[in-house]
C-alpha cells in the first residue's frame, strides 16, 4: 500500500468498525478520515480539510479537540449514530515508531455512559429481540448505566406496546428478523437498529455468553425453564454485543431477572396515551401527566423507579396493600416523612455511580460524590428502620450503609477533588507517605522560587523584576525595557516581549527541574493510588447497587406521602 503508516493503522481499525464513525486519536485531537470526515463535517459542522498521505492522494480530514469529545459524541448519539473511539494505548514519548492505537469503546445510543448523554430520571435501555415459532418474541433489556438486565416473553401482537413502554434507545436484531413485518410495525422508524448475524442469537452460543458473564456453571439458579430458549437467546446475544462495544468488559451487571406475567399490568400504547401517564395527549404540550403530578422524588433513582411503577401498575393485591401501608404511615407521621426526605436529599445517583465504577469510567469527583452520599445513609437507615410498616422497616433495617467504603473514601480522597485525575490534588494528605514527601519537595521548591523575586530584586537593583510562570516557558524572571541595562550577566534570555524580556538563571533552572520532576512523579503516583482505591470500591459494587435500589423505593414511597399531604 502507498498509504503512510498512520493511514494503514486507521484502515485496519476502520475495517473492523465499518458501521461506525471512527474517531482516531492523534495528539490532542480525534480525527476523522475519508467518508467519516465528510459525514462528520456535515453532521457536526466541522471544517473539512485534508491530510497528506505519502505517495497516495490526500485524504479528507476533519477533527475535534480531545477535551471536547463528549460534546460531539452527544450530538451524534442524539442523531442515532454509532461512534468507535480509537485511542493511543501507549505513551507517545515512549513509543518506538508509530504510537499503538486500539478501539477502546464504541458509543451507541443504547450503550452510552457519559452523564451528558443520559437522562437522570429515565433508564437508557438497549433491547435485543428474537422471534419464536409461536409468534411471540424473546426480549432482553439492559441499562448499561445501572447494570439492570432482564428478559421476558412478549406474546404475539404485544411487541409494539412493550417497546412503547420501554422506549429503548437502540434495538439489537438478528438478520432474519430485521426486515420482518412485525418489526416494521412494532419498532418506530426513528428507533436506531443494530443488525447482527443469526448465529449470534443461537441458543447454545447465547447460553455460553450468559454463563461466562456471570461466572456460573448453570443458568438454573436464575430461574430459567426448559421453554425459555427465546429468553436465553435474546439475553446472551445482548451480552455478546456488549462485549463487542466495550472490549474492556463490565463488572457491574446485576443478576438477570426473568419477568413472568401476572405481577404487573402491561398497558398498551393507547391506554398510556389516553391516561396521559408519562406524556400529554397532544404532542408539544407540557405538563399535566400523572408522572409530573406524582413526582416528588428527591433522588435520580427514585425518579426512574417512579416512572417504572406508573408504567407497570401492580396487580397482586398483597403487594399493593404493602405499598399503601408504607405510604399511609408516612402520611400520618410528618416526623418520619421529613426525616426520610431530608436524609435522601443527600444521596446522589448510587446506581449510575456503580455503573461508572463497573466500566472504569469513575472519576475523582464521582468518588467524592459517593463518599458524600454514603455519609447520608445512616440517617436514612435509622429513619426507615424505626417505621412500623413492614416494607419501610425492611428497606431501612437491611440497608447497607457501607461503612468500610465510606472510611476508605474519607481517608483517601480529597475533600473537593477535581473532575479529572490529571488535574492533580485527588489523593488526601496522609493516605500515602511517599506522595506526601514528594509534595513537600515540590512545595519547598515552589516556595524557594517565590523567594527568588525579593533576592533578585535586591541583587540587580531592579525593583519591578517579577518571577512568573506559564505552561509553555516554565518559570522566568521578567524585566521591563527600561531596566534592561541593569540585567546581571548570569541572566539568560528566554523570551522577548513587546515591553521587556524574560530570563532564567542556572539557579532558577535547577529549582524549576525539581518542581517539574516532583510534579511528574506526583501525577504518576496519584494515578496508581487512585486505581488502587477504585479497585477496592469496585469490590463493593453489588452492595452499592442493592443500597441504591432500597433508596429508590424509600424515595418513591415517601414522595407519594409528600404529594398526598401537599394536595
Identify the residue ranges that each predicted region occupies.
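Charged catalytic and DNA/RNA-contacting regions of genome-maintenance
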Residues: 1-329, 338, 342-358, 362-454
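Extended, charged coiled-coil "arm/hinge" scaffolds of SMC/Rad50-like chromosome-maintenance ATPases
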Residues: 497, 501-535, 551
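Conserved NTPase motor "head" modules and their coupling/switch loops across ABC/AAA+ ATPases, GTPases
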Residues: 1-2, 486, 490, 494, ...
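Intracellular alpha-helical coupling/juxtamembrane segments of multi-pass membrane proteins
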Residues: 320, 343, 347, 445, ...
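Long, charged, glycine-rich C-terminal linkers/tails
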Residues: 88, 250-259, 455-468, 562-567
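Cytosolic, long alpha-helical scaffolding segments
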Residues: 405, 412, 419, 475-491, ...
Amino acid at each position: 500500500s502507498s498509504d503512510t503508516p498512520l493511514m494503514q493503522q486507521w484502515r485496519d481499525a476502520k475495517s473492523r468498525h465499518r458501521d461506525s464513525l471512527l474517531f482516531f486519536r492523534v495528539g490532542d485531537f480525534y480525527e476523522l478520515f475519508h467518508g467519516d470526515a465528510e459525514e462528520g463535517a456535515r453532521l457536526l459542522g466541522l471544517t473539512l480539510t485534508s491530510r497528506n498521505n505519502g505517495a497516495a492522494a490526500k485524504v479528507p480530514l476533519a477533527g475535534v479537540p480531545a477535551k471536547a469529545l463528549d460534546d460531539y459524541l452527544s450530538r451524534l448519539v442524539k442523531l442515532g449514530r454509532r461512534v468507535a473511539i480509537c485511542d493511543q494505548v501507549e505513551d507517545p514519548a515512549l513509543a518506538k515508531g508509530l504510537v499503538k492505537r486500539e478501539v477502546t469503546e464504541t458509543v451507541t445510543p443504547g450503550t452510552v455512559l457519559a452523564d451528558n448523554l443520559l437522562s437522570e430520571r429515565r433508564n437508557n435501555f438497549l433491547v435485543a429481540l428474537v422471534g419464536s415459532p409461536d409468534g411471540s418474541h424473546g426480549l432482553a433489556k439492559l441499562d448499561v448505566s445501572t447494570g439492570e438486565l432482564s428478559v421476558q416473553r412478549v406474546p404475539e401482537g404485544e411487541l409494539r406496546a412493550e417497546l412503547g413502554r420501554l422506549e429503548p434507545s437502540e434495538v439489537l436484531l438478528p438478520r432474519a428478523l430485521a426486515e420482518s413485518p412485525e418489526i416494521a410495525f412494532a419498532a418506530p422508524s426513528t428507533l436506531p437498529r443494530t443488525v447482527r448475524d443469526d448465529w449470534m442469537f443461537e441458543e447454545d452460543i447465547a447460553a455460553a455468553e450468559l454463563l461466562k458473564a456471570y461466572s456460573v456453571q448453570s443458568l438454573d439458579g436464575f430461574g430459567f425453564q426448559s421453554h425459555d430458549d427465546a429468553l436465553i437467546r435474546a439475553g446472551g446475544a445482548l451480552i455478546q454485543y456488549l462485549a463487542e462495544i466495550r472490549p474492556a468488559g463490565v463488572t457491574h451487571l446485576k443478576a438477570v431477572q426473568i419477568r413472568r406475567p401476572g405481577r404487573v399490568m402491561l398497558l398498551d400504547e393507547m391506554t398510556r396515551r389516553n391516561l396521559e401517564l408519562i406524556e400529554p395527549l397532544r404532542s408539544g404540550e407540557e405538563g399535566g401527566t400523572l408522572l409530573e403530578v406524582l413526582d416528588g422524588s428527591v433522588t435520580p433513582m427514585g425518579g426512574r423507579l417512579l416512572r417504572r411503577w406508573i408504567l407497570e401498575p401492580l396487580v397482586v393485591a398483597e403487594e399493593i396493600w404493602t405499598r399503601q401501608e408504607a405510604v399511609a404511615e408516612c402520611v400520618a407521621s410528618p416526623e418520619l416523612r421529613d426525616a426520610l426526605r431530608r436524609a435522601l436529599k443527600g444521596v446522589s445517583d448510587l446506581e449510575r455511580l456503580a455503573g461508572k465504577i463497573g466500566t472504569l469510567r469513575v472519576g475523582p469527583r464521582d468518588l467524592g460524590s459517593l463518599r458524600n452520599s454514603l455519609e447520608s445513609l445512616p440517617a436514612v437507615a435509622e429513619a426507615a428502620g424505626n417505621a412500623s410498616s413492614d416494607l419501610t422497616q425492611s428497606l431501612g433495617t437491611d440497608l447497607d450503609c457501607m461503612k468500610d467504603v465510606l472510611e476508605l473514601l474519607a481517608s483517601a480522597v480529597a475533600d473537593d477533588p477535581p473532575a479529572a485525575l490529571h488535574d492533580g490534588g485527588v489523593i488526601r494528605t496522609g493516605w500515602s507517605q511517599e506522595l506526601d514527601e514528594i509534595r513537600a519537595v515540590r512545595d519547598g521548591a515552589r516556595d524557594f522560587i517565590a523567594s527568588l523575586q525579593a533576592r533578585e530584586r535586591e541583587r540587580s537593583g531592579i525593583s519591578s523584576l517579577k518571577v512568573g510562570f506559564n505552561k509553555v516557558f516554565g518559570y522566568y524572571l521578567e524585566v521591563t525595557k527600561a531596566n534592561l541595562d541593569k540585567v546581571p550577566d548570569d541572566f539568560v534570555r528566554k523570551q522577548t516581549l513587546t515591553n521587556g524580556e524574560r530570563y532564567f538563571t542556572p539557579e532558577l533552572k535547577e529549582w524549576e527541574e525539581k518542581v517539574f520532576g516532583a510534579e511528574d512523579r506526583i501525577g504518576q503516583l496519584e494515578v496508581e493510588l487512585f486505581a488502587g482505591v477504585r479497585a477496592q470500591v469496585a469490590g463493593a459494587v453489588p452492595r452499592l447497587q442493592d443500597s441504591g435500589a432500597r433508596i429508590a423505593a424509600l424515595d418513591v414511597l415517601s414522595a407519594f406521602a409528600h404529594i398526598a399531604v401537599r394536595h
